[in-house]
């Protein structure tokens, strides 16, 4: 599958969209803390849910992306990130918040790996070097979504209005960017396939 250089903007825009979706909830965590009535210690425990969810799928991420393809993983799981953020404004309970953050972390982790795999495949197919540009676009997107959240907090816009208002816009943007993208072939790698599960070394464990 070939991709014209002019079409590389879609993968760059996908990184931007991913950052917009991933960052929406972060500026509203203080508001959700107040609405749920969490102490600082309780909030710290609840926030463990997101990295716990993200780490739980790392061992399986390669197999999942290989099985379904990065584009499909992105189209399925980035909306999950958006929807779990919005649902956190309705299910105002510590356990519900923890579970939603864990699911959010799973969606973020897999979609984040998937967009990077897709960018690598685009580079291999086109011979271009776009990874740095992609990560630059991601940084701009995360900064923008943080600024939007800060402005809306300053205007006393409720988290529910903010996150539910952003959800259809972000999903529509994702579909507009990602649906027309062709399925890129995997980058060819030399050598035999190794074990799909690597045992951590002492250096890895610290």
Give the ranges of each region predicted by the language model.
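Short hydrophobic/small-residue motifs within alpha-helical transmembrane segments
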Residues: 50-52, 139-144
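Short hydrophobic/aromatic, small-residue-rich stretches within specific transmembrane helices
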Residues: 15, 44-51
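Pair of pore-lining "gating" transmembrane helices in MFS-fold secondary transporters
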Residues: 2-34, 102-103, 198-206
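Intracellular juxtamembrane helix-capping segments at the cytosolic ends
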Residues: 109-125
């Amino acid at each position: 599958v070939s991709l014209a250089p002019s079409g590389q903007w879609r993968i760059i825009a996908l990184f931007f969209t991913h950052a917009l979706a991933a960052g929406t909830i972060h500026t509203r965590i203080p508001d959700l803390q107040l609405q749920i009535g969490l102490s600082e210690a309780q909030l710290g425990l609840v926030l463990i849910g997101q990295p716990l969810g993200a780490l739980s799928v790392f061992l399986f991420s390669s197999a999942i992306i290989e099985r379904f393809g990065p584009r499909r993983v992105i189209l399925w799981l980035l909306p999950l990130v958006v929807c779990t953020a919005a649902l956190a404004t309705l299910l105002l309970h510590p356990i519900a918040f923890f579970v939603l953050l864990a699911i959010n972390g799973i969606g973020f982790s897999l979609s984040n790996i998937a967009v990077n795999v897709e960018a690598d495949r685009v580079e291999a197919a086109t011979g271009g070097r776009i990874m740095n540009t992609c990560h630059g676009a991601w940084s701009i997107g995360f900064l923008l979504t943080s600024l939007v959240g800060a402005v809306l907090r300053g205007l006393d816009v409720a988290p529910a209005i903010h996150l539910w208002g952003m959800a259809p816009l972000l999903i529509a943007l994702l579909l507009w960017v990602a649906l027309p993208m062709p399925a890129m072939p995997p980058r060819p790698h030399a050598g035999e396939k190794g074990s799909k599960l690597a045992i951590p070394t002492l250096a890895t464990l610290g």
